[in-house]
């Protein structure tokens, strides 16, 4: 079977909720990144075999967000394109699907990523209204809360699953706040030093007062500190420990990779960035959905015949500080490493608590960031993983191509 390479990895800067990117629909956001990838690689879009797009909040965004991305990016009608929705894992599952298709010999060049406008999520009326509503009030549901942030099996917010992990692993509020502040500090340092410049595609947003070029992550909180974090009230549970300050945000953004087989790399004279060595997808109890990376990482490492200790850089999506700390504790126990070892290699440029979590794009965003950091530092192996609402996780093991 062919090796699978990533030959391009790009994303938008991440926008705040109702922030700079909010005027753009997810199809438009994604298309801007895909178009940039095509231009930078010089690949003829007609040679792309398929486009796979993770997207969670599709209701009201018109037919086929994945297809919208492809057509708006100038990819010919003859190239198939489709969407994938496994909640937060969508942007990474698109990569896993592309990887599998190339391995199976069904494709040679695949664009895979994710796009999300949480700002653009609509409100939903119950389907029963189609049968006639004779009297009494009607309640609209928030598409974002219902379809991205609420557990379908216990009708609880994702924040409660983080509270469950905090309780199970005895993770204190102080530990969570310290973790969150560390994420903010690292992200701000990365933004200010231009660390993300190579991975970000500038997005031009039409404005009556003049077009805006958006090329810098706008979500990091420069005004926070431990004292301010400590004053925040629990967001999901009375006397709980999960707050708006130690959880990820609601965000907009898009992120994509171009994957290629060995044959395509040679045929089109492409330059590989990394090889995708293995993938993993696993499941856990939905009540502790944030622990999903643990089985996913276990599977990915086993397939790669590698140990956690072989990973020199790790991107772990920070849905919640409690969730991340729970995963770190479990992985340290399972793989015989210390918490300090793990934290030194993980999210070195900050994570979703600081940068944001556009749900359909995040799994791809952490992969893009990991790839660029691997190229900058020259490390051999990297690992990316994230949790998924409903109790799952996905993971990728990457190898630097030097």
What spans do the regions from the language model cover?
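Condensing-enzyme catalytic core mediating Claisen C-C bond formation in acyl metabolism
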Residues: 1-24, 36, 140, 226-291, ...
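Conserved active-site "lid/cap" helical segment
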Residues: 1-61, 65-73, 80, 161-173, ...
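N-terminal extracellular/periplasmic Venus flytrap/periplasmic-binding protein-like
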Residues: 10-12, 23-32, 40, 175-267, ...
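Conserved catalytic cysteine-centered active-site region
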Residues: 55-109, 153-157, 223-249, 334-365, ...
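Active-site-proximal alpha-helical scaffold in enzymes
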Residues: 84-116, 166-195, 256-263, 328, ...
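Flexible glycine-/small-residue-enriched beta->alpha junction loops
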Residues: 109-164
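Active-site pocket-lining segment
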Residues: 161-163, 199, 207, 277, ...
């Amino acid at each position: 079977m062919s090796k699978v390479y990533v030959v391009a990895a790009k994303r938008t800067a991440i926008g705040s909720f109702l922030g700079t990117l909010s005027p753009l629909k997810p199809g438009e956001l994604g298309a801007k990144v895909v178009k940039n990838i095509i231009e930078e690689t010089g690949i003829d879009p007609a040679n792309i075999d398929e486009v796979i797009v993770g997207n969670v909040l599709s209701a009201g965004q018109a037919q086929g967000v994945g297809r919208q991305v492809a057509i708006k990016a100038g990819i010919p009608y003859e190239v198939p394109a489709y969407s994938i929705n496994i909640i937060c894992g969508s942007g990474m599952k698109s990569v896993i699907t592309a990887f599998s298709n190339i391995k199976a010999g069904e494709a040679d060049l695949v664009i895979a990523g994710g796009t999300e406008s949480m700002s653009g999520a609509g409100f939903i009326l119950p389907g029963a209204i189609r049968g006639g509503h004779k009297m009494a009030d009607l309640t609209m549901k928030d598409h974002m809360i219902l379809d991205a942030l609420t557990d379908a099996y216990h009708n609880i917010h994702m924040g409660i699953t983080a509270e469950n992990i905090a309780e199970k692993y005895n993770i204190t509020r102080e530990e969570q706040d310290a973790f969150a502040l560390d994420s903010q500090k690292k992200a701000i340092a990365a933004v200010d030093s231009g660390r993300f410049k190579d991975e970000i595609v500038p997005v031009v947003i039409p404005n009556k007062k003049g077009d805006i070029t958006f090329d810098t992550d706008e979500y990091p909180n420069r005004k926070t500190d431990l004292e301010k974090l400590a004053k925040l009230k629990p967001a999901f549970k009375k006397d709980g420990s999960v707050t708006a300050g130690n959880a990820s945000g609601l965000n907009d953004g898009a992120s994509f990779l171009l994957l290629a087989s060995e044959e395509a790399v040679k045929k089109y004279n492409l330059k590989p960035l990394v090889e995708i060595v293995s993938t993993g997808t696993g499941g856990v109890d939905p009540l502790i959905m944030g622990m999903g990376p643990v089985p996913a990482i276990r599977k990915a490492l086993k397939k790669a015949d590698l140990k956690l200790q072989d990973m020199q850089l790790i991107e772990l999506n920070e849905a919640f500080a409690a969730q991340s700390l729970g995963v770190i504790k479990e992985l340290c126990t399972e793989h015989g490493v210390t918490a300090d070892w793990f934290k030194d290699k993980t999210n070195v440029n900050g994570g979703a608590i600081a940068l944001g979590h556009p749900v359909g794009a995040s799994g791809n965003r952490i992969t893009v960031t990991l790839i660029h950091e691997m190229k900058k530092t020259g490390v051999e192996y990297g690992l990316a993983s994230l949790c998924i609402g409903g109790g799952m996780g996905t993971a990728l093991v990457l190898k630097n191509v030097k």
